[in-house]
Amino acid sequence: MKKGFRGTGTVERVDFPNKGIAVTDDGDRVIVKNTIPGQKVEFVVNKVKHQRAEGRLMEVIEKSPLETEEPCPHFGMCGGCTYQTVPYEKQIDMKLTQVKKLISDAIGTEKEAGYEFIGIHGSPKKSEYRNKMEFSFGDEYKDGPLALGMHKRGSFYDLVTVSDCQIVDEDFRTILKATLDYFSKNNIPYFHRATHKGYLRHLLVRKATKTGEIIVDLVTTTQTEGFNEEELLAGFRYALLTRHYDGSFKGVLHTKNDSVADVVKNEGTEVLYGDSYFYEELLGLKFKITPFSFFQTNSLGAEVLYETAREFILGDDKDSLNGKTVYDLYSGTGTIAQLMAPVCKEVVGVEIVEEAVCAAKENATLNGLDNCKFIAGDVLKVLDEIEEKPDYIILDPPRDGIHPKAIGKIIEYGVENMVYISCKPTSLARDLQIFMDRGYRVEKICCVDMFPNTYHVETVVLLSHKKADSYIHIDVEFGEGEGKIPVDSIAKRAEAYKPKEKVTYKMIKEYIEAKYGFKVHTAYIAEVKRDLGLPMYDAPNAVEELKQPKKHPTPEKVEAIKDALRYFAVI
């Protein structure tokens, strides 16, 4: 299959992240994103690497039997919701299946590795759950009228005005419509990403789920030729505040951003009305949030996530952390740290984003917590500087996971238990392999769905340091005579019972090349080992390769691999 090939296939399964495996009539497998199991799709191959083909979705020819829900009007054009046509219970089943496969491919199944996979907790709200949106200004087609919404799927320039978006509530939709109507009526140009000319860039909207407080931040350039900015912004404020809302307006802001990059960046913010912040509540604690604060976008889902983590940490003994020090690494605005502070001696949070650390300190004071300490800096460097050692470690890293060197330093503390909260299962699977190789075992895993209708999912893992099941005390006397062990026999016995040298994939490949004169791929060795019922988890890269469409080894190579396995006494 070559680049540019246009074909059809039926989606056999979907692997995380959102990678559908479409099977053609000829049995070829192609990765096609944004698909659902059971769909018949048309695709165009746009990438071929290592005999693995990836295609761009052109059309869904036949719907999946799973698709029984009516989508919002923007489904298919907007790049936001992939699973909106699938009933919610089936959505979370799909996510659970994807994460289970990733984890079992990386560290083994529940039975093989001895952990418990509890399942998945759904979001309390299935729609209108988001507390934050970043809308972009632009047009829906070249030189079209002003649009305000989300980027079209697969497009850098074109937008979709998501006036009926179903993952936010009516207040968001009212704000979007009021803003678009106002600036359209005044003929204000948007910032063109190609020419870097124009005024309107983004509209950031946040609404607290518990308190109902709303803040809106209009992000623009400083290019004000042709209109009076002060009068324009006064009119914008009036257009917003004269509408009806279920919530209450806490602030209207204006942020300037002349950066070329198409991101929401703060180069100076002024308050047009009210305050520059609002308050949200989680599990009895209060949090002050600004337009640019990091905070989970699903408040009720966040409560489920953090409650799951807290249950993993405390278990059946709610006093287990009394008098102990907890490290919250990659602590963000300190949400988890503050939830754990009442049940331990001290919580030390480490976060690289300085603004988030300032917010964490302010929120801890707001909640009357004086045993929280937050440090701004890279976890990799800060761990070398902290003198007090932790009794427990909580990990909540960004999407890319934990740097291998940082994992090494974390493991050196030798804490009995850790909890790892992950927003990207592929990074989690990779990191768990390292923890297990270094003496930790996975005890429990649970997924939490924070993002209904999308493919994203959070995962919570409890890790514990491996310990002996029991101990036997034996008194041994060395020397000559009855009941004693001769000293000179110890070396002989040690040599006789010395563990066999670990047989690596590299050794197998070198043996085959030397004897047969050809090379074999690591994934081929893993495939043969799998067929023979042998463990493969000592070679994560090989296991990862097995998940991708690849030709099978020839019978000649299979026999060569088996010969090598016999030579090294593996079989």
Predicted feature locations:
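Phospho-regulated, low-complexity intrinsically disordered regions of nuclear gene-regulatory
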Residues: K550-I571
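Terminal RNA-binding accessory module
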Residues: M1-H74, K111, K373, K381
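Short, charged amphipathic recognition helices of the HTH superfamily
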Residues: P499-E510, H521-T522, M536
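Rossmann-like S-adenosyl-L-methionine
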Residues: K2-G7, R13-P17, Q223-Y497, Y505
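DNA-recognition alpha helix
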Residues: T504-Y516, A526-L532
